[in-house]
Regions:
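Short beta-strand-to-loop element that shapes/binds the nucleotide-sugar donor at the catalytic cleft/hinge
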Residues: 149-150, 154-176, 181
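Catalytic core and acceptor-binding pocket of nucleotide-sugar-dependent glycosyltransferases
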Residues: 179-211
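Conserved glycosyltransferase catalytic-site signature
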Residues: 114, 136, 177, 210-211
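N-terminal anchoring/stem segment of glycosyltransferases
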Residues: 1-99, 122-127, 184
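Short His-Asn-centered micro-motif
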Residues: 6-10, 37-40, 112, 133-135, ...
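Short acidic-hydrophobic catalytic motif
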Residues: 102
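GT-A fold catalytic core of metal-dependent nucleotide-sugar glycosyltransferases
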Residues: 105, 109-161
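Short catalytic/ligand-binding loop motif for oxyanion handling, primarily in non-cytosolic enzymes
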Residues: 14, 44-47, 62-63, 139-142, ...
């Protein structure tokens, strides 16, 4: 199995946490795993040679068109405040968060991860899986390839860390998306990636319940 691990970090946080997490992957992941770092700022000078850096500003210009268009719209940034001509949350929303500031509607912030994954999947010849891991994840011991193989089965399109709690009966409303695998051998993965990107390029993401 050939795995392409991808991650990114918020500009200005390389020294505070991202370097530690990403370099722990270098130290603990097997050689069959390649590590790609998507950067929005100048490439860090102290990045390990095993890491391939991708300039996100050049690789995915559509991301920054989206962010520039909606950066001054508080609703698109998770706020309850609205502006004239701005986007609106769905009138069909239910639940306690619908009238509060919430990450559930911070489309501008979370668009970065979407376009990193889109770019990685579309530039993945020779790989079996693209695996997103948040940059603040610290790998504290060696991870054998067999462990990845168990987590990334061949028959599923996506793999993620669920938070299903039978006592809550909520169906696992908020999954942990700091670890998500995309099976490149599955026939629907690239269709999914295309549809995911299309939510952002024309702004259709604002038509769904949560962004």
């Amino acid at each position: 199995m050939k795995i392409k691990v991808i991650t990114s970090y918020k500009p200005g946080t390389w020294g505070s946490f991202a370097k530690r997490g990403i370099h722990s992957m270098v130290e603990q992941f097997p050689p069959e795993v390649d590590i790609f770092l998507y950067c929005e700022e100048q490439q860090p000078k102290d990045v390990d040679d095993r890491i391939t850096c991708v300039d996100l500003t050049q690789a995915e210009t559509e991301l920054f068109k989206f962010k520039d268009k909606y950066k001054d719209d508080p609703t698109a940034n998770g706020k309850i405040k609205q502006i004239e001509g701005g986007v609106r949350r769905s009138p069909n929303l239910q639940g306690l968060d619908k009238d509060k500031d919430s990450f559930l509607w911070d489309a501008v912030r979370f668009a970065n991860k979407v376009f990193c994954v889109v770019n990685a999947v579309r530039n993945s010849d020779g790989y079996d899986y693209v695996l997103w891991i948040d940059a603040d994840t610290f790998t504290f011991r060696s991870v054998p390839l067999e462990f990845f193989s168990k987590l990334l089965p061949e028959e599923t399109m996506l793999t993620y860390l669920g938070r299903e709690n039978p006592t809550l009966g909520d169906g696992g409303v908020y999954p942990e998306c700091g670890f998500v695998g995309y099976n490149l051998k599955h026939p629907e993965t690239r269709n999914f990636i295309h549809d995911w990107e299309r939510l952002y390029t024309p702004g259709d993401v604002f038509k769904i319940l949560e962004w």
